[in-house]
């Protein structure tokens, strides 16, 4: 599937958001035109408008994400897998407005609803769930971890994979997540650390699958740690489709571009074409299947 130093095969962005009021189909088309074949469409809270106040609000918000996925499949022809769940920042914001107990109760209910929709085949993964990626009070942090442990237990009982939204604290972050997985009975290979660094070493991932934020320098980081990697991993942009932050976090064309750059970098490492093809196919197809299905 290598052709003139480029990759002609599956290319999947494993964490992308779309907004029906912003670029939406144009962003999906941009990804497709660059060579992309599939996306994981991750539910995005309406931080700029209004957050869900009850479970019916969540049901409507989740349905909007499912509707967008359907339109992208129909209009653009991409393979779209949906990730549904309540965002941990939503929980933190609402803990300040409705109280931590009510916010937690709503959050857990929203997890349950997402798992029901996953069980029904509407989505394939719970996410992005986790804990605040910024500093909060010690009390709030303890509550976030208690809630995340419960969410992991729910995912384990439902046999659902999860995508994790967590802080960047070096190797300690994945070590913490691995410990929580073990306590919850959730297999580590079903807990995907989203927005991960390009350090693929076992020390950094603690055996968790990760989706790497494929910004500048990511190819170099991947190549320098690839021999110490024993986890499945994928690529993501975390494209927000936010009119207030155009292009953030990374643009829709990034993953096709970085895939081709990785092919060239691996060739410079004296990998032969067959080995490169197997590896890229693992990233964009085989490891996705074993993690999510």
Predicted regions, residues:
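Positively charged, amphipathic and often flexible ligand-engagement surfaces
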Residues: 236-237
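Mid-domain alpha/beta scaffold segments of enzyme catalytic cores
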Residues: 1-158, 164, 175-184, 194-200, ...
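Short loop->beta-strand "edge-of-pocket" segments that line small-molecule binding or catalytic clefts
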Residues: 233
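Solvent-exposed, charged amphipathic helical/linker segments at domain boundaries
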Residues: 186-188
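Gly/Ser/Thr-rich loops at beta-strand to alpha-helix junctions
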Residues: 168-171
């Amino acid at each position: 599937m290598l052709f003139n130093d480029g990759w002609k095969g599956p290319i999947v962005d494993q964490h992308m958001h779309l907004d029906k009021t912003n670029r939406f189909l144009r962003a999906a088309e941009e990804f497709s035109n660059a060579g992309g074949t599939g996306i994981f469409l991750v539910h995005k809270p309406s931080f700029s408008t209004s957050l869900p106040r009850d479970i019916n609000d969540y049901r409507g918000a989740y349905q909007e994400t499912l509707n967008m996925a359907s339109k992208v499949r129909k209009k653009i022809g991409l393979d779209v897998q949906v990730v549904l769940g309540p965002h941990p920042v939503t929980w933190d914001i609402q803990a300040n407005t409705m109280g931590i107990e009510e916010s937690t109760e709503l959050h857990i209910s929203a997890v349950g609803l997402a798992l029901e929709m996953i069980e029904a085949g509407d989505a394939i993964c719970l996410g992005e769930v986790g804990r605040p990626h910024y500093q909060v009070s010690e009390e709030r942090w303890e509550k976030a971890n208690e809630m995340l442990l419960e969410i992991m237990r729910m995912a384990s009982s439902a046999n659902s994979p999860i995508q994790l939204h967590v802080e960047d604290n070096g190797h300690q972050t994945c070590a913490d997540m691995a410990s929580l997985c073990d306590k919850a009975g959730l297999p580590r290979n079903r807990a995907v650390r989203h927005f991960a660094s390009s350090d693929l070493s076992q020390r950094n991932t603690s055996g968790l699958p990760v989706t790497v934020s494929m910004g500048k320098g990511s190819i170099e980081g991947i190549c320098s740690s690839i021999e110490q990697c024993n986890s499945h991993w994928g690529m993501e942009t975390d494209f927000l489709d936010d009119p207030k932050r155009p292009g953030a976090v990374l643009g829709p064309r990034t993953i096709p571009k970085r895939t081709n750059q990785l092919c060239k970098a691996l060739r410079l490492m004296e990998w032969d074409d067959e080995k490169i093809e197997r590896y890229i196919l693992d990233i964009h197809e085989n490891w996705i299947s074993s993690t999510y299905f």
